[in-house]
Amino acid sequence: MDSLLLLKKSIAEKKDVKLLASSEATSKVEKIEDAQYILFDENTSPILIDEPTKFIKLENDSHFSLRSVYFAWLLRDTSIAEYIQQCSELGIQNLTFLERTDLISWLEGSSDSEHIIGLEKPKPEGSTDAATSMDVDLHKKSEEVNWLFENTRTVSNHNSVLHGIKPIDFISLRKDVLDYIHANKATASAHADEQERPAKKRNRDPIILLSPSASSLLTMHNIKKFLEEGIFVPPAEAAHAAGGGRGPELIALSHKSSNSKFGTMRFIIVEGTEKFKPDYWDRVVCVFTTGQAWQFRDYKWSEPHQLFHHVKGFLVQYVGDPPHPATHDWNVEGIFVERLRRHTDREVVSQLWDKLERWMENRWPLWNGRR
């Protein structure tokens, strides 16, 4: 039986899955990074934990290993940020948010998965006999149909009699139809252009990306208050005030600039790029990072130097902490906030906006289209 089906069966039957250091059933280990084999059932043989499964990444059809799949199941109740961080620390390939959700739903039996290929469903009992019986019936029926065709005589009816035998030239009619189709297409195209123009303008809102790292000082819980009101709330405190759990997937905020060239602008803030379309990257103006390169793994520009050539980079730290090496290695700007003295926050945020606006005016390709 396939390893994915064995895992799903073990989950359904609530059986203990054993991680093994070797193919011996007695070599049990606790940590997944120490495991070389995995045992789902005492009646089956241990399976190499790094063997590819039939759970694939749709973008390139690459197969996730059994280690990646099982680790995603073990951390199913953790946030996506914490899961990605642990994958990075252990060197395990991580699944994206949508891939992990899809996998967990399939393992729990609540839905099918488009990421899983080539799994054979078990045949119901008696299916072979039923198929044989059906083949016999079909063969018998085909003989009867052939007999009917051989002994059927075609007769004329009022429809066949009215059919003419003289060939008719429809070229002139075909030309009229083509002219009508082209005229309709031109009208529809002009109407579509009128509808699309305001939509394109609305969709030019610049995008800010946050780091999903658990060590990030700016999260989806506290970023809006920080950038709009100039007040920094520690991430743990902000998450607690919001009732815990994951923050929103998308935040829209307005910023009124002191520079008359900018006026009031609307920014979109997201943490992950799973739902990004290719043209969204033209709208990304800023990336907040913690200095961990795994953050950019699924970005259009996954290499830090290349990324921060195209977007403005910020790295937020507490006052008194040593400057992170990324501030000079990657060309990102360090932003320092006080741990306790909140009266300094507004000035820090004002300086951040000034730096971002200057970058947008000089470097952002879509800036000219917004003026």
From Swiss-Prot:
Keywords in alphabetical order: Activator, Cytoplasm, Nucleus, Transcription, Transcription regulation
One Gene Ontology cellular component: Cdc73/Paf1 complex
Gene: cdc73
Gene Ontology terms: biological process: positive regulation of transcription elongation by RNA polymerase II; transcription elongation by RNA polymerase II
Gene Ontology MF terms: RNA polymerase II complex binding
Localization per record: Cytoplasm; Nucleus
Name of the protein this chain belongs to: Cell division control protein 73
Assembly and interaction partners: Component of the PAF1 complex which consists of at least cdc73, paf1 and rtf1.
Record's function text: The PAF1 complex is a multifunctional complex. Involved in transcription initiation via genetic interactions with TATA-binding proteins. Involved in elongation. It regulates 3'-end formation of snR47 by modulating the recruitment or stable association of nrd1 with RNA polymerase II.
UniProt KW S-adenosyl-L-methionine keyword: no
